[in-house]
Amino acid sequence: MIKYVVIIPARLKSTRLPNKPILKIKGKPLIYWTWKNCVKAFDAKKVYVATDDNQIKTVCNEFNINVIMTSAKCKTGTDRIAEASKNRFKDHLIINVQ
């Protein structure tokens, strides 16, 4: 069986829509809805949010969403996923959800 993980990169410093991951839609943050749709297709234990921001981490913890903290040096979502998976998921298929 193929080992896999789903990683959702998230940051608050978007120029087009600041704080996007924690903006609320129907009373819940956008990052929750992204995660919720991922767990419809994948095992929740294998879905992670990769972020450098403690506010996003706090929101994820409120909803029992797996979080991987990354450095603020990541310039793109793909960079963040690469850093998050580098040592932890070497032999896994990485599914990038952006």
Regions found by a protein language model. Name each.
Residues 54-98:
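Short phosphate-binding loop-to-helix
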Residues 2-50:
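N-terminal glycine-rich phosphate-binding loop and ensuing alpha1 helix
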